[in-house]
A protein has these predicted regions:
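Cellulosome-associated attachment modules in secreted, modular CAZymes
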Residues: 9, 13, 17, 392-458
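Beta-propeller fold detector
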Residues: 24-48, 103-113, 157-168, 211-230, ...
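Signature of short aromatic-glycine-proline-rich micro-motifs recurring in repeat-based ectodomains
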Residues: 47-66, 113-126, 135-140, 166-195, ...
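Conserved beta-propeller blade signature
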Residues: 69-72, 132-134, 186-192, 252-261, ...
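Short glycine/acidic-enriched loop and turn motifs that connect beta-strands
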Residues: 76-85, 139-144, 194-198, 261-267, ...
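Beta-propeller blade signature
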Residues: 88-101, 144-156, 199-208, 268-270, ...
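Blade-loop segments of beta-propeller domains
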Residues: 88-131
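Loop/turn-rich, solvent-exposed surfaces of beta-rich toroidal or solenoidal domains
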Residues: 266, 280-344
């Protein structure tokens, strides 16, 4: 009977949440801060499900979380008819609920009312600081201009925001970063890219209210970098990423004048707009060095502490599979003083080649009322996960909202997954939180009680 009920509950969870589960790991608190996995959908934990998803594809290279929704951009998905006998390979944006992993209706991407079918046309997707989701395509070393679009997150329609010039240095561009307001209505905007197999970086700037973007290096569109870490590196190699630093304490928080660059053979290093290295992994414990071939980094703040998350290995990493480190930065936000908190997932997302995409996407959203950070982790062709980080996550000794096993503030199918993992012994939550029917034991009857709570709430 127990096995039957757990199987039935798992079937319900799978149906409702696109077969997402939790990673089954227990992460020890550090400095009173906890991390719990809300859900995970990947090759390692859901090996019969994730590989069948349409967003498990080497053309689905980047993803972003925005306002509680995950957007996964896949180029050239299907043939769309634009005229009799004429088709284009239309791009699609797949959407998931960030709280549960449940699939939402996908968006067929259009431009000027027609199917959008550019080669790697949605290669890079992200969001600005004002909730606008943007899309920028791959461009080759023969292409001089870069179109930048905003995405209507309800219809899939693209709107051309600007066309950026590469100037005299024309290199291949893969992945981009945007800080500020891409519409320039509420703030300035800065856009950056590091060219592929060159030492060139691009930067474009527009003041609030400005019509056009200009060169972001004192008027210049690009800059040649001469300092790398490790010092033996001479260019960014393949698929580098840039991440500009948001500084809420500054009078110009969206200036992005400090930024990380993470290249194929280099590790994340912090630069300024003169091209000088401000900080690097030189003084970091060698055990925390990321391996070559994986590119991805992000920052966040919590409990007046400054954190960084960075990719530590590709799919073929030594003992790793598409994982990341979360570290607290040292005094003055120094890399050399970093303290490791956790490796996520503790086991793996997957160990399957992504065809050379190399990018590893991270971004966060803040729940200021609960002092909780939601972290989204996406590795192309291997999987994705959502984590809650804070002092009040993970099911404390005293129960909070009845049924909120993972303490993310809502009661839904992700809590059923968490409870099942508790019963199976693959996750640790307080008994007081998991004893839904208050009979003094935690077992399959609590799963039934929790499902009834969810159904009643819906």
């Amino acid at each position: 009977m127990k096995k039957f009920l757990l199987t039935a509950a798992l079937a319900l969870v799978a149906f409702a949440s696109a077969f997402a589960v939790t990673d089954g790991q227990t992460y020890e608190p550090v400095n009173g801060i906890k991390i719990v996995n809300s859900w995970i959908l990947d090759r390692f934990h859901t090996p019969t499900v994730f590989p069948k998803a349409e967003y498990c594809n080497t053309r689905a290279r980047t993803a972003v979380m925005n306002n509680g929704v995950i957007y996964i951009a896949r180029s050239e998905v299907k043939a769309a008819v634009v005229a009799p006998g004429d088709t284009v390979p239309q791009s699609v944006i797949y959407r998931l609920d960030a709280k549960t992993g449940a699939e939402l209706p996908a968006l067929d991407v259009t431009l000027d009312g027609k199917p959008y079918g550019e080669f790697l046309g949605v290669n890079s997707i992200g969001r600005d600081n004002f909730g606008h989701v943007w899309v920028i395509p791959y461009t080759s070393e023969k292409t001089a201009d870069i179109p930048v679009y905003t995405l209507n997150v309800e219809t899939g329609e693209l709107t051309l925001v600007t066309t950026l010039s590469k100037g005299d240095k024309i290199a291949r561009t893969d992945y981009y970063d945007v800080i500020g307001d891409i519409t320039r209505e509420k703030a300035e905007c800065n856009i950056m890219n590091a060219g592929t197999q060159v030492a060139t970086i691009y930067r474009w700037h527009a003041d609030q209210g400005a019509e056009e973007f200009e060169g972001g290096f004192e008027g210049d569109l690009s800059l040649e970098i001469t300092a790398f870490f490790p010092e033996t590196v001479t260019n960014w190699s393949y698929a580098p990423v840039v991440k500009m630093c948001y500084d809420p304490a500054s009078e110009t928080p969206y200036a992005g004048e400090l930024f990380y660059i993470d290249g194929f053979n280099s590790v994340p290093a912090l630069y300024d707009v003169t091209g000088s290295i401000i900080d690097s992994f030189e003084a970091v414990d060698k055990a925390l060095y990321p391996e070559a071939g994986t590119n991805g980094v992000a920052e966040f703040t919590l409990d007046e502490r400054n954190f960084m998350v960075y990719s530590i290995a590709q799919y073929a990493g030594t003992g790793h599979g598409c994982q990341a480190n979360i570290v607290e930065l040292g005094e003055g936000m120094s890399l050399g003083g970093m303290t490791k908190y956790w490796q996520i997932p503790a086991d793996s997302l997957g160990q399957t080649s992504d065809g050379g995409n190399r990018v590893h996407c991270f971004n966060v959203e803040y729940n200021d009322a609960q002092d909780v950070v939601t972290l989204f982790d996406f590795k192309s062709f291997n999987g994705m996960a959502v984590y809650q980080i804070g002092k009040n996550v993970g099911g404390g000794e005293e129960p909070g909202t009845k049924g909120d096993i993972n303490a993310d503030g809502v009661v839904n199918v992700s809590d059923v997954t968490a409870l099942i993992n508790k019963i199976l012994g693959t996750a640790t939550y307080a008994d007081a939180t998991c004893d839904i029917n208050a009979d003094g034991v935690v077992n399959e009857s609590d799963v039934t009680a929790l499902i009834n709570i969810i159904l009643a709430g819906n």
